[in-house]
Amino acid sequence: MSTLFIISILLFLASFSYAMDISTIEYKYDKSSAWRTDEEVKEIYELWLAKHDKVYSGLVEYEKRFEIFKDNLKFIDEHNSENHTYKMGLTPYTDLTNEEFQAIYLGTRSDTIHRLKRTINISERYAYEAGDNLPEQIDWRKKGAVTPVKNQGKCGSCWAFSTVSTVESINQIRTGNLISLSEQQLVDCNKKNHGCKGGAFVYAYQYIIDNGGIDTEANYPYKAVQGPCRAAKKVVRIDGYKGVPHCNENALKKAVASQPSVVAIDASSKQFQHYKSGIFSGPCGTKLNHGVVIVGYWKDYWIVRNSWGRYWGEQGYIRMKRVGGCGLCGIARLPYYPTKAAGDENSKLETPELLQWSEEAFPLA
């Protein structure tokens, strides 16, 4: 075995080991000193590339992405050197400009949202009334009603992931079965929405109702591209969907106390792109462009499930500050939830893979 080969193996193993612990590098920045050297940034860049299996088309693209990475790292360092309620860090999107990030990963269509706001029936089921005795805290992950975090990839299908997540949860709450369902079926078959180019929750819910159910992820796996609609089983069904009273965080809290709810938010800021941990407090606007799911709350924040994989945020989650009214990033402007009768036997048919919940699978805030 050649010496060169042995050295190559050792370098690979070393880079792999460092990449797995890249978080220890992220915050070694002291604002009182000069910023990182190019050599230090290049080392961090190489470790980050290894961790996320990034491969570029050539040297020109590699250098272009390095410059973007360097700018983002400086932005992250400067934020973390100040007094904030949350930290930013290296995410899978640190080699993207904010404009590129928005174009690829934000997929809730604001044009559709504005049309639907005038037509959707808002339920008074979760209208907040003085004297309502709500739990001080709730976390549906702890109750085994949430599947592991998923990853939408380079496809603007957040609308499908957030809708499916709430259907998975209400099905578990009503039947006791936690089943991972198919986002790809919605991307391929829900023609009122736009596949990887965005969509709306209500059209996704209506498709599941009209279709008589939705298939499992195992039967109809995710591809991150829109393809032809193919035959699918009707494993889990819902009865309907309702809107929570708009711009009322107390009503939203009441809804989440009963079941996870889908919401649209403004996720376009650089701070959101690079969020790593803590209670996110902005900045952000109220232009709704990304679908997520509220799976719980604490006294001053929401526990929000994203669909960008476990390397973003707190293992795929973000804690967002509760501010009242329409909420931070517009989180209370357009909340919905699916409805399903208790004891619906349909969701117990043809379900070969029930998920076993374990606390290790979820980073509890």
UniProtKB/Swiss-Prot annotation:
GO biological process: one example: proteolysis
InterPro entries: Papain-like_cys_pep_sf, Pept_asp_AS, Pept_cys_AS, Peptidase_C1A, Peptidase_C1A_C, Peptidase_C1A_papain-like, Prot_inhib_I29
Source taxon at top rank: Eukaryota
Location of the active site: C158, H290, N306
Glycosylation (residues): N83, N121
Expressing tissues: Laticifer.
Record keywords, A-Z: Disulfide bond, Glycoprotein, Hydrolase, Protease, Secreted, Signal, Thiol protease, Zymogen
Assembly information from the UniProt record: Monomer.
Name of protein: Ervatamin-C
Organism the protein comes from: Tabernaemontana divaricata
Lineage: Eukaryota, Viridiplantae, Streptophyta, Embryophyta, Tracheophyta
